[in-house]
Swiss-Prot record:
Organism: Marinomonas sp. (strain MWYL1)
Native organism taxonomy: Bacteria, Pseudomonadati, Pseudomonadota, Gammaproteobacteria, Oceanospirillales
Pfam families for this protein: Ribosomal_L31
Protein name stated in the entry: Large ribosomal subunit protein bL31
Amino-acid positions noted as binding Zn(2+) in the UniProt annotation, renumbered to this chain: 16, 18, 37, 40
Entry function: Binds the 23S rRNA.
Recorded name of the encoding gene: rpmE
């Protein structure tokens, strides 16, 4: 392997907007500021909203489901 071609791998602090901080190892070299983390993301907190796509399926079946082909 060649010497001195790889970037330095150092400890970095990732700070979320909610105030949570994480210690990571990275080649970036400076601290990270992120918008969401596992403490405030809706998927992990249980505040996720479910999208109902049943209306589209019903509309499709109403338009095309009644048509039958006879051979």
């Amino acid at each position: 392997m060649k010497k001195d071609i790889h970037p330095n791998y150092s400890a970095v602090t990732a700070t979320c907007t909610c105030g949570n901080t994480l210690q990571l190892n990275s080649t970036l070299g400076s601290d990270l500021h992120v918008d969401v983390c596992s403490n405030c993301h809706p998927f992990y907190t249980g505040q996720q909203k479910m999208v109902d796509t049943g209306g589209r399926v019903d509309r499709f079946n109403k338009r095309f489901g009644a048509r039958r082909t006879t051979k």
